[in-house]
Amino acid sequence: MKKILEAILAINLAVLSCIVFINIILRYGFQTSILSVDELSRYLFVWLTFIGAIVAFMDNAHVQVTFLVEKLSPAWQRRVALVTHSLILFICGALAWGATLKTIQDWSDYSPILGLPIGLMYAACLPTSLVIAFFELRHLYQLITRSNSLTSPPQGA
């Protein structure tokens, strides 16, 4: 799954870079531009960000503040990990719910140039929150079933 997401990110970034570069050349070199590039780049950037968040989560690359947790005993580290993963799971659920509502609400509104549904931008949040929630459920399961687990399992493992 990670390789597929990385390939999607690479294609997205390549398309985004090319269309913006071409539009810059056209705008400053020939005093014209492709109007749809601005809208398309917004959509691509939003999806790039949310798919990138999934890959970063799988790589355990998100910012973590661990200096306090590392000073705790293994039993307390496990308790804090349970609370942390539970909170992340709750936030993913809230994010998925809100993204679904906003996507449905704005699906009938269309962008002025491309005519794409505005809800398509909000829809990018849904797969991100669901995939991260899946990993969090797995982490919670591993923490609960491992009686001698000292620390939280790796994020993307």
Swiss-Prot record:
Pfam families, per the entry: DctQ (PF04290)
InterPro entries xrefs: DctQ, TRAP_DctQ
Name of this protein: 2,3-diketo-L-gulonate TRAP transporter small permease protein YiaM
NCBIfam families in UniProt: PRK09877.1 (NF007374)
Gene coding for it: yiaM
The keyword Transmembrane helix appears for this protein: yes
Keywords carried by this UniProt record: Cell inner membrane, Cell membrane, Membrane, Transmembrane, Transmembrane helix, Transport
Membrane topology annotation: Multi-pass membrane protein
Organism of derivation: Escherichia coli (strain K12)
